[in-house]
Amino acid sequence: MKYLLTESVKHLKIPSIKVEKGVFSEGEIYFRIKEDIRNKPLIIISNITTDNLLEFLFSVDAAKRAGAKIKKIIIPFISYARQDKVYNYGESVSGGVICSILKNLKIPIIIYDIHSKLLKKYLSFQHKTLLPILVNKIPKKIRKDCIVIAPDSGGVERAGKIAKSLNLPLMNIKKVRKGRKIIMNFDKDVSGKNIIIVDDMISSGTTMVKAAKLLKKEGAKEIYAISTHGLFVGNSKKELGKSRITKIIVSNTLSIKSSRQIEVVGVNKFII
């Protein structure tokens, strides 16, 4: 996240503050701001993940105690957003827990392409998207004549906005459970059409791989996928690489390297 933060402030010519970080032998985190920031306006940019949650909270606390005027917190990527409700008895709504912690900071917050807006009942935040920047990286000849697809019902609103901005038709992949199998159905003819799959994040990539396979079977031509956050867990890159997806375009909100199939777009100057 350090790279994104540093690059984000370069174009504004805003100085980033020096900090001292460390981990004690017993595993406790140490955080200290090494500059005088009393009465100075401050913007904090940080992802929220399992690995850095405590460091983030300590940085906010340190800034407050040092007398800074924290104007806002910008969160390019927030973990646990998929845990937005109780799906099975006894579960924690971990996304709600994280948002409740952020709420107690009492600082304006901006989050980019959060997976579930249901978390707004736990935290009031400004939601922004980076998807229009990513879709512009798709060749114009593809964008002019294609179908925009939401990989699941939860992404229809997200994909719909992209489709509307490009004046293109929107299609939702409908999933029907038959016994232990989940069958995917399309509500439009994709034969001879180029496809843009729109999603907020790619994690295992399983749904995207299955969708691409079915799209090709139904006669689709070029398949492009755009997603703000590229998690690419496990063997997802390998599986996506074997799929018929022409190009996957993601932002650099997470640390990921470009490859033959994956294009990583720098969004630093759009974050702040």
Language-model features: where?
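PRPP-associated nucleotide enzymes
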Residues: 1-272
